[in-house]
């Protein structure tokens, strides 16, 4: 054991001396001598071998020295267990391309048959027979692999030619150049197969440094597996390796190398920044390492986000240091889980002088997932995924706050531009906010920098990860002034297309293409001096167009009253199929009405046949209901009943409709009420309700007017309990007025209800006279009441005698009614209607009140039109 340790120490010293001599004598002769000693396998070879240790090339794993592979097997060599970077000469390049490149051209694939270690004899034999033949090939591979060898002491490839290498450059200069070139190549790659490109570069930098790799790789191993192994091995030892046994490691060497810091040697730009950490609990670790990838196909037959694996072939996703454990199964799953990744926290770095300097502050994490242990550090830092992820959606308060901040920034920049117009102030892109459709439309109309309103945005590209992103606002005054006209025009255009009201106005303002014949008629109608001899036969083929035109419709209406039947028939045959459409046309409905008035019986029957089955629809339309009313006037009674019967199941709906109530009224007027029993039966229990309805009160009046005595009695029996309410109702007062207008020769029930109304009015004459709607009932009571009924009402208003009339109190009924804006009309009716002593007392009371107003110089009611009218009435009245 002690002998082995002494031998190890001697070999270590020999390695250091060899490295120093190689650095001081970097000529090719020394390199060849060193290489010769290695090849011969003697003592000189063992003395020539050495390790040049650097902090960036240390390792914590067991590895075999590459050059020792030439000395013998791992079992026979005591020096084989040392882990140091080889400084010997690299082995010669093999002309058998399959050893390095395989059948597919991938030099990661090695064959197990070519992994036997080389002896000195076989090496010399190989060198003797293949040096001259492979000189050109070695030069090509030398250029392909970046002109770099892991050997410090010798040439890039031992091919027997002293001038094969450019001996003027040392190891570190070559190594640095290859690192820079490789780093640039890695950073410039943006293809999905960048993993293969990175593995190729690493292999170029360190290939042929050791033949021990051939003992560790199996035949036809997939490129992804090789790539991970290459990355893992090159980071830890600086050479390509895979440990085949853990029993041969030296515990003392592991403890000796444990304190060396681990550096990233492949990405020069990131070496002072990222330091890998094997502690899974280190949340603020700076270096992020990728794990070992699973075995899978290397032919890139699967999408890059699946790491080249077919779907549903793996169950557990890879572990990332300081990243959550997730499956990379689909882009959406990948993106959604990468949003919550861990961001490296703040960390102090150490400069070249050994002093710590503070790094820029960064958020430590987005979430706090548990990070798995780092089993295989990647040779270069994994990029921050948050740099490529779209921002998460903002909440409503955050969106409002962002909008307010954006508006404040725009206002400040506009103010700065006003102060100094020669300075350009860039404006950040505003954050798009989802909003309702109407609000978007409003924003689009009023935002001149919206893509729809600004032609300068044609060359601008929005963020593809953001929906409805808005380009940067152009704050140049010159550009704003030059594009103002276009923006205004576009704003008007978007305004017309964004509001339904604007669209309807635009449709109304559209210019219809009229026929020359219609244009001629319109021109002749506007010119009063023109004498147009056009008749119905002249518009043959244009009847429908004329019916829908204002001037054309008037022309047809005028001609139908005087034209012969033949010409009417020609026009009717053109429009008969469009009778339903024309009935609801603003101008065409008058033509259909004229055909009911002046048309033949056959023409009327044809129109009635088209109306059958459409009565409900036509009765509810604004213009068609007028056609139905005209038809009920001119068609036969049987046809009227047949048409109205279609409305039997919708009488209440028709009565409450602003158009349908006119059809019901016309039906009651033109059809005997006994033929329409369904109308009154539908209104049973709804009489008072309909009497207070704006349209129903009209139908109730028509029923009282044209109904039979039994019908009138049934209606009045429902109304007599609601007389005080109907008198003061804005629609019910019309029903009461109709009852008051009926004379005494009507049926007994009507006379009794009228007397009841007069008594109710007389008992509340002052209150009803001052009421806006009830005052109308009081006036009708005075006008249409009998002499006894009139005297009953007047007795509640007139003063007792002449002295009382000259000295009326302010709270007397006469004075209260004169002052009121509604009741003074009742007083005017009393002056015109009253006779004899009653009229004399009324005139005296009015004059006394007017004299009192003049003496008191009161301006309260002096100049009211009603008071002046009263003064004019009593001035000429004879007392």
UniProtKB/Swiss-Prot annotation:
Domain PUM-HD: 513-871
Residues recorded as bearing Phosphothreonine in the entry: 83
Amino acid composition bias (Low complexity), ranges on this chain: 237-255, 398-417, 449-463, 472-491, 501-512
Region Disordered: start-end pairs: 222-256, 344-417, 443-512
InterPro entries, per the entry: ARM-like, ARM-type_fold, PUM-HD, Pumilio_RNA-bd, Pumilio_RNA-bd_rpt
Membrane topology: Peripheral membrane protein
Positions of Pumilio repeats: 538-573, 574-609, 610-645, 646-681, 682-717, 718-759, 760-795, 807-844
Transmembrane residue ranges: none
Protein's job: RNA-binding protein involved in post-transcriptional regulation. Negatively regulates expression of COX17 by binding to the 3'-UTR of COX17 mRNA. Promotes decay of COX17 mRNA by enhancing its rate of deadenylation and subsequent turnover. Predominantly binds to mRNAs encoding mitochondrial proteins and localizes them to the vicinity of mitochondria for translation. Regulates mitochondrial biogenesis, motility and morphology.
Protein name: mRNA-binding protein PUF3
């Amino acid at each position: 054991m002690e002998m082995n340790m002494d031998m190890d120490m001697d070999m270590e010293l020999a390695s250091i001396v060899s490295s120093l001599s190689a650095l001081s004598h970097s000529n090719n002769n020394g390199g060849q001598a060193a290489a010769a000693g290695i090849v011969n396998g003697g003592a000189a070879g063992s003395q020539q071998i050495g390790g040049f240790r650097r902090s960036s090339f240390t390792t914590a794993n067991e590895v075999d020295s590459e050059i020792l592979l030439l000395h013998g097997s791992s079992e026979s060599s005591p020096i084989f267990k040392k882990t140091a970077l080889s400084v010997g000469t690299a082995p010669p390049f093999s002309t058998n391309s399959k050893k390095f490149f395989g059948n597919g051209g991938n030099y990661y694939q090695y064959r197990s048959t070519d992994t036997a270690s080389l002896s000195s004899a076989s090496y010399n034999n190989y060198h003797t027979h293949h040096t001259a033949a492979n000189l050109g090939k070695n030069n090509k591979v030398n250029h392909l692999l970046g002109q770099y060898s892991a050997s410090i002491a010798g040439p890039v490839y031992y091919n027997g030619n002293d001038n094969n290498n450019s001996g003027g450059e040392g190891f570190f200069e070559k190594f640095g150049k290859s690192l820079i070139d490789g780093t640039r190549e890695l950073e410039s790659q943006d293809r999905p197969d960048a993993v293969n490109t990175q593995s190729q570069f690493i292999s170029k930098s360190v290939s042929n440094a050791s033949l021990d790799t051939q003992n560790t790789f199996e035949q036809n191993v997939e490129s992804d597996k090789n790539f991970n192994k290459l990355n893992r091995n090159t980071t830890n030892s600086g050479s390509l390796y895979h440990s085949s046994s853990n029993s041969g490691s030296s515990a003392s060497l592991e403890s000796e190398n444990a304190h060396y810091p681990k550096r990233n040697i492949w990405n020069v730009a990131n070496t002072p920044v990222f330091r890998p950490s094997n502690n899974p609990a280190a949340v603020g670790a700076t270096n992020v390492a990728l794990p070992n990838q699973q075995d899978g196909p290397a032919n890139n037959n699967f999408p890059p986000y699946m790491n080249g694996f077919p779907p549903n072939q793996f169950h557990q996703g890879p572990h990332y240091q300081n990243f959550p454990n997730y499956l990379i199964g689909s882009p959406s799953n990948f993106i959604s889980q990468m949003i919550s990744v861990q961001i490296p926290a703040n960390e102090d770095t150490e400069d070249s002088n050994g002093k710590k300097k503070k790094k820029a502050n960064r958020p430590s994490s987005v979430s706090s997932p548990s990070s798995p242990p780092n089993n295989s550090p990647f040779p270069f830092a994994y990029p921050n995924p948050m740099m490529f992820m779209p921002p998460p959606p903002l909440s409503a308060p955050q969106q409002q706050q962002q909008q307010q901040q954006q508006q404040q920034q725009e206002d400040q920049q506009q103010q700065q531009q006003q102060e100094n117009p020669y300075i350009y102030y860039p404006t950040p892109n505003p954050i798009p906010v989802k909003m309702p459709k109407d609000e978007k439309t409003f924003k689009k109309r009023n935002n001149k920098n919206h893509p729809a309103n600004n032609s300068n945005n044609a060359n601008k590209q929005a963020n593809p990860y953001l929906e409805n992103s808005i380009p940067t606002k152009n704050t140049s005054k010159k550009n704003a002034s030059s594009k103002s006209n276009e923006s205004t025009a576009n704003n008007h255009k978007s305004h017309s297309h964004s509001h339904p009201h604007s669209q309807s106005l635009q449709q109304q303002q559209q210019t219809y293409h009229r026929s020359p014949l219609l244009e001629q008629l319109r021109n002749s109608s506007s010119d009063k001096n023109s004498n147009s001899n056009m008749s119905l036969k002249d518009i043959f083929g244009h009847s429908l167009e004329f019916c829908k035109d204002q001037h054309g419709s008037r022309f047809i209406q005028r001609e139908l009253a005087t034209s012969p039947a033949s010409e009417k028939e020609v026009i009717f045959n053109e429009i008969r199929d469009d009778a339903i459409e024309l009935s609801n046309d603003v101008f065409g409905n008058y033509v259909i009405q004229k055909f009911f008035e002046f048309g033949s019986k056959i023409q009327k029957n044809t129109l009635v046949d088209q109306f059958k089955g459409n009565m409900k629809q036509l009765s509810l339309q604004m213009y068609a209901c007028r056609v139905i009313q005209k038809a009920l006037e001119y068609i036969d009674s049987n046809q009227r009943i047949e048409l109205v019967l279609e409305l039997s199941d919708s009488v209440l709906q028709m009565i409450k409709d602003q158009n349908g109530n006119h059809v019901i009224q016309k039906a009651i007027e033109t059809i005997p009420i006994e033929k329409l029993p369904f109308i009154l039966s539908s209104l049973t229990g709804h009489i008072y309700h309909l009497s207070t309805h704006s349209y129903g009160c009209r139908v109730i009046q028509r029923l009282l007017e044209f109904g039979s005595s039994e019908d009138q009695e049934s209606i009045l029996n429902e109304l007599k309990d609601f007389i005080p309410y109907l008198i003061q109702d804005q629609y019910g007062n019309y029903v009461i007025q109709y009852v008051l207008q009926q004379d005494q020769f009507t049926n007994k029930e009507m006379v009794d209800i009228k007397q009841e109304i007069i008594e109710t009015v007389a008992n509340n004459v002052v209150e009803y006279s001052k009421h806006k709607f009830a005052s109308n009932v009081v006036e009708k009571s005075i006008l249409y009441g009998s002499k006894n009924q009139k005297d009953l009402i007047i007795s509640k208003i007139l003063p007792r005698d002449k002295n009382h009339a000259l000295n009326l109190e302010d709270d007397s009924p006469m004075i209260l009614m004169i002052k009121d804006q509604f009741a003074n009309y009742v007083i005017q009716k009393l002056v015109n209607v009253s006779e004899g002593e009653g009229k004399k007392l009324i005139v005296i009371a009015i004059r006394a009140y007017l004299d009192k107003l003049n003496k008191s110089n009161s301006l309260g009611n002096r100049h009211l039109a009603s008071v002046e009218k009263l003064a004019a009435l009593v001035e000429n009245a004879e007392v």
